[in-house]
């Protein structure tokens, strides 16, 4: 009886492990737009803006209804979003400044989970050690490099 129980337990464990390996992780996609509010997107009820692709995308994922930004400027807000820290806490305040060396970003937390992290478009975060994106595709403006004021005056 004990051998039968052990055999069944081992077989079930192996089956469970093989099923666990087949589970795929969800894709995480975050849209960030400067000067955009819920009045600007159809998925939030705008009748003036036609955003069918974003609206369709929103039906397949999570839509936030209680979100607030940490700063009224682009760079500190992006640093806050990517690090989870208030801009002052990461060293990224005021605008066009760098996060402190050693600050962990979403990239550092997602890599151990097997994710590849890309940034497409406007960057406005630095230094690269804090934001080591696997892929960066600059916007049409060619923002390949972001040089902060704090880097210039160090």
Predicted regions and their residues:
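Formylglycine-dependent sulfatase
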Residues: 4, 19-154
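Bacterial N-terminal signal peptides
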Residues: 7-15
């Amino acid at each position: 009886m004990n051998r039968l129980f052990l055999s069944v337990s081992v077989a079930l464990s192996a089956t469970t492990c093989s099923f666990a390996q087949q589970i795929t992780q969800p894709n995480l996609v975050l849209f960030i737009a400067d000067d955009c509010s819920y009045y600007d997107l159809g998925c939030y009820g705008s009748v003036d803006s036609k955003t069918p692709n974003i609206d369709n995308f929103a039906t397949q994922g999570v839509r936030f209804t209680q979100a607030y930004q940490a700063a009224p400027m682009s760079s500190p807000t992006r640093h806050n979003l990517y690090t989870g820290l208030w801009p002052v806490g990461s060293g990224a305040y005021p605008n066009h400044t760098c996060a402190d060396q050693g600050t962990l970003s979403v990239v550092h937390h997602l890599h151990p989970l097997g994710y590849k992290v890309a940034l497409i478009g406007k960057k406005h975060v630095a230094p690269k050690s804090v934001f080591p994106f696997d892929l960066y595709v600059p916007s049409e403006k060619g923002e390949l490099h972001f040089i902060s004021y704090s880097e210039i005056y160090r």
